[in-house]
Amino acid sequence: MSGSALYETFARAPLAFDHGEGTWLVTDKGERYLDFAGGIAVNSLGHSHPHLVAALTEQAAKLWHVSNLYEIPGQSRLGQRLVDATFADKVFFTNSGAEALECAIKTARRYHFVKGHPERFRVITFEGAFHGRTLATIAAGGQYKYLEGFGPKVEGFDQVGFDDIDAAEKAITPETAAILIEPVQGEGGIRPVPTQSLKRLRQLCDQHGLLLIYDEVQCGIGRTGKLFAHEWSGVAPDIMAIAKGIGGGFPMGACLATDEAAVGMTAGVHGTTFGGNPLAMAVGNAVLDVVLEDGFLEDVQRKALLMKQGLAAIADEFPDVVEDIRGTGLMLGLKCAMPNTKVNMALRDQHLLAVPAGDNVIRLLPPLTVTDAEIHEALNRIRAGAKGLADAIAVAAAK
């Protein structure tokens, strides 16, 4: 037995943080780190944002939990605000992204059931996807490393290559219920789906009577410079799962749907004990207060351009370390020319936190509130880390 009482499911970095201030994290030893990991795209407004702290503490002094047996005013308000800002007519609140995806999958299957087609339950997904860690969502993601050892894969998911819309079309059968896609893959390596591909998927869904589901758990809530990433394409889904940034660090998610898509989600067919609790709703409403302020998303776009230009210069200077820059908005990736774990360690040595992803990519996911000065500081640290790695390559080559 190890010395820890915790499951050994995480390869944790040897860092423990005492508190956070905006874009900065401070360890229990007083060391400061520039946080461009953002709790894996969760801390949309950074650490200890005063508006979020005030909303949470005010609600905490009043009411924490009553269950969904009763009306929750904050839930009704946040639901209406999400409806007003999106394609959706209905919202179901959850505690996480995986729960939001479970709700999305159930909504799609239930739709076909009440329409008289219970045989339509299969969902087409894409290589490199990550939709959560439940038995259904690891089946949807289709990655062997997450499926291994958990028994038979949950039936009903058909995976095709990333952005292979021809293959998606060929995968449609009389049993297909929906197509599920991340407009920008996060875990898969910061891979945006081209607008034309989303348009074709929408056409296929309309042609075959399928529902189009977006997973915007990581790329939503302003991360790309729009409230939701799919807005760049103008292609609306029927169902969408969100989480991470909407809670700003508090555990919450939501499944959004049109009236038509949600027609089967009647009383008793789905539920949650904690989803939509007063604390989460207070924080979610506070996040929207900030993100929906006039000019906020435009400023995210401006800062994203500043950061991307700086990263491109680093890639040009150190091609043996960084091959390419990916992403959109403040959801950016370094496609590494060496193992991304080495690059991640080099950045951590510079007291900059980032997140490894698939396809040998390092994710950079700063708060949407990051300042220009902090972006320049991050670029300086990334350049220093890249230079150290490039110098080591040169020394090794000279031997």
UniProtKB/Swiss-Prot annotation:
The keyword Cytoplasm applies. Gene3D superfamilies: Aspartate Aminotransferase, domain 1, Type I PLP-dependent aspartate aminotransferase-like (Major domain). It catalyses: N(2)-acetyl-L-ornithine + 2-oxoglutarate = N-acetyl-L-glutamate 5-semialdehyde + L-glutamate. Keywords: Amino-acid biosynthesis, Aminotransferase, Arginine biosynthesis, Cytoplasm, Pyridoxal phosphate, Transferase. One of its GO terms (cellular component) is cytoplasm. It is found in: Cytoplasm. GO terms for molecular function: identical protein binding; N2-acetyl-L-ornithine:2-oxoglutarate 5-aminotransferase activity; pyridoxal phosphate binding. Its EC number is 2.6.1.11. Binds 1 pyridoxal phosphate per subunit. May also have succinyldiaminopimelate aminotransferase activity, thus carrying out the corresponding step in lysine biosynthesis. This is Acetylornithine aminotransferase. It comes from Mesorhizobium japonicum (strain LMG 29417 / CECT 9101 / MAFF 303099). The gene is argD.
